[in-house]
Amino acid sequence: MIEALPSGIVLGLIPITSAGSSVTAYLQYRRGDQLDI
């Protein structure tokens, strides 16, 4: 049980981190698009 908690936290953080970086990259892309007008 003690080892299941950290692995569960890591497995929970991986999708959150990847989704967050994807959203950040998308927002930066959109911002660059608007500046290029």
From Swiss-Prot:
<dbReference type="GO" id="GO:0009535">
    <property type="term" value="C:chloroplast thylakoid membrane"/>
</dbReference>
<dbReference type="GO" id="GO:0017004">
    <property type="term" value="P:cytochrome complex assembly"/>
</dbReference>
<feature type="transmembrane region" description="Helical">
    <location>
        <begin position="5"/>
        <end position="25"/>
    </location>
</feature>
<keyword id="KW-0812">Transmembrane</keyword>
<dbReference type="Pfam" id="PF02529">
    <property type="entry name" value="PetG"/>
</dbReference>
<keyword id="KW-0602">Photosynthesis</keyword>
<keyword id="KW-0249">Electron transport</keyword>
<keyword id="KW-1133">Transmembrane helix</keyword>
<protein>
    <recommendedName>
        <fullName>Cytochrome b6-f complex subunit 5</fullName>
    </recommendedName>
</protein>
<comment type="similarity">
    <text>Belongs to the PetG family.</text>
</comment>
<keyword id="KW-0813">Transport</keyword>
<dbReference type="GO" id="GO:0015979">
    <property type="term" value="P:photosynthesis"/>
</dbReference>
<dbReference type="InterPro" id="IPR003683">
    <property type="entry name" value="Cyt_6/f_cplx_su5"/>
</dbReference>
<dbReference type="InterPro" id="IPR036099">
    <property type="entry name" value="Cyt_6/f_cplx_su5_sf"/>
</dbReference>
<comment type="subunit">
    <text>The 4 large subunits of the cytochrome b6-f complex are cytochrome b6, subunit IV (17 kDa polypeptide, PetD), cytochrome f and the Rieske protein, while the 4 small subunits are PetG, PetL, PetM and PetN. The complex functions as a dimer.</text>
</comment>
<keyword id="KW-0472">Membrane</keyword>
<dbReference type="GO" id="GO:0045158">
    <property type="term" value="F:electron transporter, transferring electrons within cytochrome b6/f complex of photosystem II activity"/>
</dbReference>
<dbReference type="GO" id="GO:0009512">
    <property type="term" value="C:cytochrome b6f complex"/>
</dbReference>
<comment type="function">
    <text>Component of the cytochrome b6-f complex, which mediates electron transfer between photosystem II (PSII) and photosystem I (PSI), cyclic electron flow around PSI, and state transitions. PetG is required for either the stability or assembly of the cytochrome b6-f complex.</text>
</comment>
<keyword id="KW-0150">Chloroplast</keyword>
<keyword id="KW-0793">Thylakoid</keyword>
<keyword id="KW-0934">Plastid</keyword>
